[in-house]
Amino acid sequence: MDYSKTLNLPTTEFPMRANLPQREPEIGRFWDEIEVYQLVQAKNAGRPKFILHDGPPYANGHIHLGTSLNKILKDIVVKFKSMDGYNAPYVPGWDTHGLPIEQQAIKQLKIKRSALSPVEFRRMCREYALKFVDIQRAEFKRLGVRGEWHNPYLTLQPHFETRQIEVFGEMAKRGYIYKGLKSVYWCADCETALAEAEVEYAEKESPSIHVAFPVVNGRGLLPDQDAAIVIWTTTPWTIPSNVAICVHPEYAYVLLRSGGRAYLVARDLAGNFRELLGDPGAGVEREYRGEELEGVVCRHPFVERDSVVVLADYVTLEQGTGCVHIAPGHGEEDFALGQRYNLPVISPINGKGYFTAEAGNLDGIFYLDANPVVVRELEARGALVGYSRMRHQYPHCWRCKHPVFYRATEQWFASIDGFRRHLLEAIDRVQWIPGWGRDRIRGMVAGRGDWCISRQRVWGVPIPIFYCGDCGRAVITDETISHLKGLFAEHGSDVWYAWEAAELVPPGLVCPHCRGRGDFTKELDTMDVWFDSGSSHWAVLTQPDYWPDLQWPADMYLEGSDQHRGWFNSSLTTAVAVTGEPPYRAVLTHGFVVDEQGRKMSKSLGNVIEPMEVLKELGADILRLWVCSADYRGDLAVSPGILKQMSEAYRKIRNTFRFLLGNLQDFDPDRDTVAYTELTELDRYALLKLHRVTDRVLRAYREYEFHQVYHTLYNYCVTDLSAFYLNVIKDRLYCEPARSVNRRGAQTVLYAVLDSLVRLLVPVLAYTTEEVWGHFPANGKKPPSVQLLEMPEPNPEYLDDELERRWERLLAVRQDVLRALEAARQEKLIRDALEAEAVLYAEPELLEFLRENTVQLPVIFVTSSVRVLPAAEAGGEEAVSGTVAGLKVAVRRAPGTKCVRCWTYGETGVDPEHPEICPRCATVLSGLNL
């Protein structure tokens, strides 16, 4: 007889092979068909809101691993919150203006910018941006991210732009917007001013020069004939714009005599300077305190201009000479110092980075190419004291990656000083995750200068300012902003370029400054794109006509740590300026994606991993599992090897689901559930472990400790389930009568485990949990999608401290037995545990404990028999000590013969009709009416 046909073997259509790259798109289409986002929102209507406001990615190019990481983290948060008692809408957004889109539109559409009108060029930029919105939307959806994809926010939408100029107008009304000449970051390649947030530092090689400025009026302190003050700089091209030399008022300075000339440098740097001169014996003629030197006049090395000594506390002694060359036209600190001393601002470089005629013989030379020209001129004049090359961190444009420089131009600014104190106070009212984010953004806000918000570009939101034709002053009032909001809402911001100023101003506009009604002109600069995205809290969260589920402020912003200086900062600035409050209650930041060696992803290093390629090869759930597994507070390492490890971890989780489903194929929870009080001790312990795991995972989700979610659930599947509970109940599941309380009790636990496990993993394994839900035992109340479920609640009924202590002790004994069984396998004494009899020799207290639990031991050891004997009877037998004190374990061949149905060894042949099976199996068969 084929006894295998009498067993309750697991059966399920849930496939062993995941085949995620093929199966996931099918599930994605299913979500679209049932409109799962709308179903979730309907289910959660009326609940407390949790608003995660999406930081808009740039609509330029395909998504990369960094944007994938960010979107998956957001999806984990939103999905969990929507299953944890909240109404958690998610409206994705895109940043759609700015120079990179201009450049790519020109490149890909093969158009000539100068041949197009601003309106035509803006139309092409819009088409390009919208194309990549569609591309990225499909890619984000493929990651399994749920959201209001049919109704995202775009910074180019008229209803967004109207709110943006409303924010601008309100800031202007409060006196925070002004136009002024300042030294700002400038990108020659992009031909525009940059904000601090648009600058990143990268290593660059530069010339390092020491330059002597001859003293012409030493004010009785320094010789007027043969003395010079020595400055050090890595930007020789700024020397033509020098107007002053700065020293620290409290530092000591010395006059060194060498080769018939006297040089002034900081005392603490004199040793280095002697080495530079090659004159270690250069003597000190006199020492000065920095503040004494104020007003000393030097002559510019090759320009007919004086250079006066000024004082500032920011001078350091880290390198150089302690004497700093000052060019207010080419440095933020220089400019501020120049304002204090009323110094001239010289900035003879145009927007493309070329010197103008004002620079004399440098006219027409690109500023970086001017370095060797300046060095040669200094050398010819005898002013070059030292020259070398050095590598150092230098500011670069984060869009085009070219070096940037400071250039004094007239720009529009937001005055941070006007409300800096309010910004710092607002920061303290926000929860920062991790906590160090608070100090980081406080430092940035405390030290930042005014925000340069104007850009010399066309593709952007125009700065909504007119100029009076009579007095020339800027005009921005409630009336002009209100009128423009109506025009922008109806026509979009293109109207600014399509219409003349006379058509844009409100009818009968009167200049508030001179009461003139003359011809008005319009500002041609656009707003910094950080003002676009920085206004999104107001443009998106306060527009119920477009996004009725949202509200202000957001509960959370979640972005990479670089956004402390970017979106977090710009959003905070506009919100506090307009409302006095931060736009977010909490800010969560994550690190960057790096390779196994901690290096950034780079094509030159060949370590770039494209997310869409991962999806094609492994599936989105593998990427999502990787995101969850890593501690996002630091940089996140990824490589093909790491993704392979995640695939293996996923396989183990999937196999756990498959085992659970396979053994619940005949289980109806409404009909077959066994009451807790009727369950075996083993089953009650399994439910206790489930309670602990559920509680731990829910706390980890709520505290945004997602890596703890992963590690807890993975270890639960592998250790608590696969290696223990699921293994030891196989005999009950397969061999006991199908409807017996013993088997139904085990199934009751399996159902509870499956029900909790699938819910707990929905935010992480979006596709797989949906697939599991499709095979879930039906009980007539099953919603169409797993995403419509709630998180499981830990069941306090399962808590039993005494049971837990007892079973933790039993499992410790089990570990010693498993080690002894493995040793017996290695020695070829047995092939598997059912061929064994475990003999436990125990000291009195442990002996009593084990005898009290004798019935459990063969089950949890998965051996055919177990004997428990006093330690004194161990004798000379090969009994091995383990980790449990007072215990030795010996393994023998189990007595009896093998039951061909359940494979345990013992008595067989009791039933003459079934001579090869054990009495238990014979009893089961008798009830089957074979």
UniProtKB/Swiss-Prot annotation:
L-isoleucyl-5'-AMP binds at E559. A motif ('HIGH' region) lies at residues 57-67. Monomer. Belongs to the class-I aminoacyl-tRNA synthetase family. IleS type 1 subfamily. PANTHER family: ISOLEUCINE--TRNA LIGASE, MITOCHONDRIAL, SOLEUCYL-TRNA SYNTHETASE. This is Isoleucine--tRNA ligase. The keyword Ligase applies. Signal peptide: none annotated. The gene is ileS. Keywords: Aminoacyl-tRNA synthetase, ATP-binding, Cytoplasm, Ligase, Metal-binding, Nucleotide-binding, Protein biosynthesis, Zinc. A motif ('KMSKS' region) lies at residues 600-604.
